Amino acid sequence: MPNNSSDSSSILHCSFCGKSQNEARKLIAGPSVFICDECVDLCMEIIREDKSDQLEKKRGGVPTPMEIKSTLDDYVIGQDNAKRTLAVAVYNHYKRLESNDTSADVEISKSNVLMIGPTGSGKTLLAQTLARLLDVPFTITDATTLTEAGYVGEDVENIILRLLQAADNDVEKAQRGIVFIDEIDKISRKSDNPSITRDVSGEGVQQALLKIIEGTVASVPPQGGRKHPQQEYLQVDTTNILVICGGAFNGLEKVIEKRSSKHHGIGFGATVRKNSKEESVNVLLKELEPEDLLAFGLIPEFVGRLPVVATLEELSKEALVRILTEPKNALVKQYQKLLEMENVKLTFTDGALEALAQRAIERKTGARGLRALLESTLLDIMFEIPSKQGVREVVINREVVEKQIEPLLIYAEEALEANA
């Protein structure tokens, strides 16, 4: 006679719902406990809902365009038109994500952004400030390192991997992040003529970026690098990821001028325009049309997926002086804080600030070059001050910047008496 009691005792059960191994599709073993696949799914759903609730509470609503611009004003000087354009685009994008309206009669597409402006005009800083304001994952990618799949270089999927890493590998959080692709103008089509060699870092990369910009489920290798058949992939939906592309687009103003000059005619009835040398790049960029980007080398599908275009102006000397002193993280304030830790006051005269701005313009580095100029100007001071006794104030004037002479050091009275 068979022993049924021993057979029943060998059947394993889920420690949570009590289902036997025969009733469950999968039973996962732990230290003296078991859990079935249905309980795992239920636990995942509870965690997912909890995360979603926490995210909603943390977000507390999307800032209005005016609030977004006000925050950008605290960190970025000038560029009002670009700020307004970005504020509206970002507001509409995240408002679209927050909307619970799932009706199929109106589908709002995402507003990816193309920022065009010279080096050091604030493109990267604007994107970074937006991500910090919205408290979303953010990553910066250099488009020049990207190549088509199968060629030496970075795969496009690595952009999503970096965003995932910025989100602490939280897929849902990454799917609401911001990607900034810099130097996008460097992947313009090299030539209109067909060639026997493949353009793997130009048009090929534009084609590869299309799906990520528009929205797709990307298969991302969790450890990065190239894809392997045996590797497990993370599935990331890029539909709700805001993509901001930026580039200097040097020479684009010539394309705009060439296109616009065709509409003015020739002869006695022609409209008289100023000489192109007298027209600033800023004015020409305001006349930008999609056909100009096509002529520059971007493919039609790529231009069509970047509906919002924000143009940034070349920074004037006055704007660069304001950048040195006004933002919350202004460079002058940072160096003043560093010397304040040594109980020394750092003072810049108006002439010194103007000289720094003028040198940045001459180097064509914009605001990005200001830090390097300040570093070289203050190097000796930062080296010597910790060892000098009794220094109360350091004054930087125009001659210190232009001629690299010693700055004026003001000592405390008691230090002067001791030296006497």
UniProtKB/Swiss-Prot annotation:
The protein, known as: ATP-dependent Clp protease ATP-binding subunit ClpX
Domain of life of the source: Bacteria
Subunit structure: Component of the ClpX-ClpP complex. Forms a hexameric ring that, in the presence of ATP, binds to fourteen ClpP subunits assembled into a disk-like structure with a central cavity, resembling the structure of eukaryotic proteasomes.
Cellular-component GO terms for this entry: HslUV protease complex
SMART domains: AAA, ClpB_D2-small, zf-C4_ClpX
Residues reported to bind Zn(2+): C14, C17, C36, C39
Binding site for ATP: P118, T119, G120, S121, G122, K123, T124, L125
Molecular function in Gene Ontology: ATP binding; ATP hydrolysis activity; ATP-dependent protein folding chaperone; protein dimerization activity; unfolded protein binding; zinc ion binding
ClpX-type ZB domain mapped to chain residues: 2-55
Protein's UniProt keywords contain Chaperone: yes
GO biological process: cell division; proteolysis involved in protein catabolic process
Pfam family, one: zf-C4_ClpX
Entry similarity comment: Belongs to the ClpX chaperone family.
Cross-referenced InterPro entries: AAA+_ATPase, ATP-dep_Clp_protease_ClpX, ATPase_AAA_core, Clp_ATPase_C, Clp_protease_ATP-bd_su_ClpX, ClpX_bact, P-loop_NTPase, Znf_CppX_C4
Known function: ATP-dependent specificity component of the Clp protease. It directs the protease to specific substrates. Can perform chaperone functions in the absence of ClpP.
UniProt keyword terms in alphabetical order: ATP-binding, Chaperone, Metal-binding, Nucleotide-binding, Zinc
